[in-house]
Amino acid sequence: MNIFLDVGAHTGETTKAVLTSKYKFDKIYCFEPQRKIINELRQIESDKVIVNNYGLFNIDCKRDVYSKDVTEGGSIYRDKFKKILFTEKCDFVSASKWFAENIKDEDNVTLKINCEGAECDIMDDLFSSGEYKKVKALMIDFDVRKIKSQSHREQEVREKIKTSNIPLVFMLGSEELNKMTKNETARYFRRRERWVHYWLDKLFNK
């Protein structure tokens, strides 16, 4: 089965773009812990889309998620924001546990992670458990680069990914952003659907 995991689904920007792309998936699992924005995600009309109102992390827990406003994507790391106006207690599930219970070895899994700083916690959990071996394609956005207390982890996880033998990898972090052209940067920050199609092409046309 071809499965897409949208970790840090927000209001469904990536999922909507995946549904309009030339790459076809049997199921799209969305993970979004913030109740304040989950309703928009649930309005996506597709039998393929399964919405989970919890985030993936390295343990099962409840944690505060901080954001600048009620529509902003939030982070479990308070120091991502200079000013916090909204805090919500959210549910999280161990990524390795979820993989073990829901993903089969024969599944063809594409994993997208863009979750405002928790990406390194998730990947470390998948690496330590061995569940990362079920991932055939990975797109990871290193938001830890924006968080002083976590920025050192970007390079650590990069090295693990490089030696992991995950077949297809697209990383977006400090290194890539420094090399991007103005057009690519505009595509990333302003045209989310086009950007998703761009990195899907980068992944699957290697």
Protein language model features and the residues they cover:
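Phosphate/nucleotide-binding beta-alpha loop and adjacent structural elements of enzyme active sites
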Residues: 1-206
